[in-house]
Amino acid sequence: MKKLFLISLFSSLLFSASSEQIEQYLSISKADAQLVSIEQVFDSMRQNQEREDNNSQEINQIYRKYLEEHLSSNELEELLALYRTPIMQRYVVEMESSISKEDMSAFLKDLEENPLTTERLDIVDNILKLTVKEDEILAFYKSMTQRYRKASKKSDNNQTIKPTKQEQQYVEMVKEGSKNELLYGLQVLSIEEMKELKSALESAVISKASKIESEAMIHVMNQFIQGITSKPQAKVQETNSTL
């Protein structure tokens, strides 16, 4: 009986999430909001490419499929339960609110004149570490710039693991922007609420989901890069054949 239970438990942990679970999760967590930014990157990289109307749909499909294949059904149920708690729902709402550059500048200027308590700043820093991982930012940046780094591929063998100056600048820029958004979004939360939020974000399943979402973004980027690097050659061949 014990063996059967363990086998059953193991199977349930490996069982992939369903499309419906992924849809529910993205609806409540707003995790796919980051696809808007990646589409903007694609638009800028597609300057000399013919834009296809189904690109946005393909991006969403690839992203959702990756989550579906790398998160188990049990993990999705756990994530849904966490995101349905009042503190996580409030977190999503507050962080989803947009803010103009002018308002953010005014907010940061006010912070200089009226500094936050050390306790609040420490909690924000801890939440930042939980939600923004340097290695994930760096991996995405490298994926985003791979098309332009092929020319220097021959020197890759001599490169060290240490990020380049440009890569480190990108990481710091993302971290600074994310921290400012946290400071602004969480200003309405009490210290106790922030501690509760930090505790929720420390959950192992949220940490895994964040990692998988980051990998999904990179997967989408890689799929896109492969597409736009192959299309120009096809167009050239087509042009030559018509001459």
Task: Kindly label every feature range from the protein language model.
Residues 78-132, 203, 214-220:
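Surface-exposed, polar helix/loop patches in the mature regions of secreted/periplasmic/lumenal proteins
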Residues 36-40, 75-80, 91-94, 138-141, ...:
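Surface-exposed patches in mature extracellular/periplasmic domains of secreted proteins
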